Regions:
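Structural preference for solvent-exposed beta-strand-turn elements
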Residues: 1-380
Length: 380
């Protein structure tokens, strides 16, 4: 194999592979990236048990061939090269890869290409659709943060992806796409109605493993405005901007999220998001790293009171609510959960709906009607 390619172009597929490449792999080959050169250009493949990433890039291919080398080492070398550099990759004896740029050269010891797992992404198209990438990117941002990290609860280790016809007399290519995640103490739901193409008209529901869902963010950074979602066997393949991510489906039953989301709270207040976030940050500066100290949120006529106590002291802050004349309510929350919602929602205002110290809090914003968040209270 012998190819020449601009440094900037080479950096893109290597960057997209980084999240999949294992730092401490049980199988050494999973720390490597497979490079295939043909007359069509370069194809980079990185794989682990739940995710496979394939990224393509145009290149001047002098001699076709393949190489398998440590993906992080190659990425570190390439990104450190001067901007505008032309990089030459060539294979030598004993599976070594030579990297040249100007008067500099590097060698990486590799593996035989046949030792790399066969490409797990099937070339045949499955059932799916083509849609606006920006919608998927936004929904993913607003749900991925609340995925459970506890491996003993596999159904919660991913993002539920639902696709269904819009119905109600809408055109056949009008669908509703929904993403939901929960860790058992909080829940996030984001949905959008959008016009798509190549839709099969069927309802689909899959749980995307969180590692694969995270990798989608890398390919969504590309310039291509569209993304294709395909359902192939037990996997979901999402393609955009000359890159494909295959995510393993978690074959578990996702909880019935509709039973968790309250319709309304007994009390509803709308706040300026930046003001609320700043107050929560200041008051929660006394919070322990274990997150076992609740932020006490109290509503009473004309104001919201935020309080927190810790061994080192206590904090008290008030926010004026001139329009609130409802009942007095006091609830405890993990302050980080409140801040997480404010961060991912990113709207000018946020609405909190509360009932009592034992009931979940509903958070949403008029600017984003398709997004709702639920936070369970903490014992005070």
């Amino acid at each position: 194999m012998k190819v020449r390619i601009d440094k900037a172009a080479l950096t893109v597929p290597l960057y997209r592979a980084q999240g999949v490449i294992s730092r401490k792999p049980m199988n050494n080959v999973l720390a490597h990236v497979h490079i295939a050169a043909s007359e069509d250009g370069l194809v980079f493949t990185a794989a682990e048990y739940d995710v496979t990433v394939v990224a393509e890039v145009a290149a001047d291919v002098i001699e076709p061939g393949a190489a398998v080398v440590n993906g992080r080492s190659l990425f570190d070398i390439v990104r450190a090269l001067p901007d505008g550099a032309t990089v030459q990759l060539s294979t030598e004896a004993n599976n070594r890869l030579r990297i040249e740029a100007g008067r500099a050269y590097y060698y990486l010891n590799g593996m035989a290409p046949e030792e790399f797992p066969p490409n797990a992404i099937e070339d045949t198209q499955g059932r799916g659709l083509l849609c606006d990438k920006s919608h998927l990117e936004t929904m993913l941002k607003r749900t991925l943060f609340s995925v459970s990290q506890e491996e003993n609860r596999p159904a919660l280790n991913g993002v539920l992806l639902e696709i269904e016809p819009e119905g109600n007399g809408a055109p056949a290519n009008q669908v509703r796409i929904r993403m939901v995640s929960t860790d058992g103490t909080r829940l996030s739901k984001a949905e959008r109605s959008m016009t798509v193409s190549d839709y099969d008209g069927q309802k689909h529901a899959w749980i995307l493993h969180h590692r694969g869902a995270s990798e989608l963010q890398r390919i969504f950074e590309g310039a291509d405005p569209s993304a294709r979602i395909e359902f192939v066997g037990r996997n979901v393949v999402i393609s955009s901007d000359k890159a494909r991510v295959q995510v393993r489906q978690i074959e578990e039953r996702f909880p019935d999220y509709t039973r968790v989301i309250p319709e309304r709270g007994d009390a509803s207040v709308t706040l300026t998001t930046s003001e609320f976030m700043s107050a929560v940050r200041r008051v929660s500066s006394l919070a322990s790293s274990r997150g076992d100290s609740p932020l006490r949120v109290e509503l009473e006529a004309g104001r919201m009171v935020l309080e927190m106590s810790h061994n080192d002291g206590e904090a008290h802050e008030e926010i004026d609510l001139p329009d609130y004349q409802g009942a007095k309510i006091k609830v405890g929350f993990n302050p980080r959960f409140l801040l997480d919602v404010c961060n991912v929602l990113g709207t000018e205002h946020i609405t909190l709906e509360l009932s009592d110290q034992f009931s979940p809090c509903l958070l949403h914003a008029d600017e984003e009607p398709g997004c709702v968040f639920v936070i369970m209270p903490m014992r005070m």
